Amino acid sequence: MYKRQIDWRGDLDLTQDPFNEVDSLILSTVSYIDFELIETDLKTEKATIREAGEQFNRLHADEKIKAGRLVPDSIFRLLDVMSRTPRFRDMILSDYVNQIDEEEEKQFSAITINLGDGSYYIAYRGTDDTIVGWKEDFNMSFKAPVPSQLQALDYLEMIAKKKRGKFRIGGHSKGGNIAVYAAAFTGSEIQKRIMQVHNFDGPGFTKDIIDQMSQGEISERIRTIVPQSSVIGMLLEHEESYEVVASTQLGIFQHDMFSWQLQRNAFVKVDDISASAYKVDHTLREFILSMNAEEKEEFVESFFCVLTETGAKTLSDLNLKEILAIMKRLNKEEKENKKILTQAFRMLLKIPTKKQL
């Protein structure tokens, strides 16, 4: 999908074809790249997208780098294509942050991109392959705020102090959630500098957080875009409305941003999410609402205890034998718990149900 967009519009810079929603998703997707795999230390230095792409290709030409179980490996091909197109190649990457803290139960990563038109794009990474990252996602159901939301706010305010000019903010999955959180909770002076916020299939918030949000005028600049069969993006509460994009995939696989359909410089939109997405959303929502905060915490601890007992740090660490053992263990749970736990585990590993095949 992205290659088609870059092939169509990649020869046009932002003065010839203004920044659009597909550009925003492409740049938010860049946040999934592990920039510690290139020579330039983007935590303290800068590099253009062209330089980053060239360094990556030179250092890893003979390797098959895996992005993890949930992030498509084509993410690295995207960097290569971007590095060779006038639209993206001279954009400057900087202020890379990548933090995993098991004790704090935090997974956070972000990067800032100088667009070259006097504005910056802050890209927040969504949940990656780490088990601690997914536990933080589940913690959102009973804990507010979670560490990555606070870190996203700190990062925005740090960048706003360092850089002059306007900002666009975006992220996919949890990255979209923390982008909205940062924009909504920062001060009015920084909010005035935010041009737009994109939440691409990111989960919503607990009612406590929504009640605290001082979105004000910034709410008019927040756009939430989800695929037809959105599961992740329908979790928890959304105060803002959302737009629905067509996807070439089915079910939970539509969370893969590479499957979203586009026409020229915009997404192909549909009227609403699918009936199956409504059903999954209703099931999960009813289950979440049926428990108090203490019960939710106990449920999350129970679920992730099953995963961490294997010794795995990432979902990719789980081999077939361990996956089958986990499924067997989940089958011993009480009927209602078993249904939700199994659904959650399938979601994490992108294991389709018979209805999705």
What are these regions (language model features)?
Residues 3-120, 124-139, 143-166, 187-357:
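Alpha/beta hydrolase fold serine-hydrolase catalytic domain that processes acyl esters and thioesters
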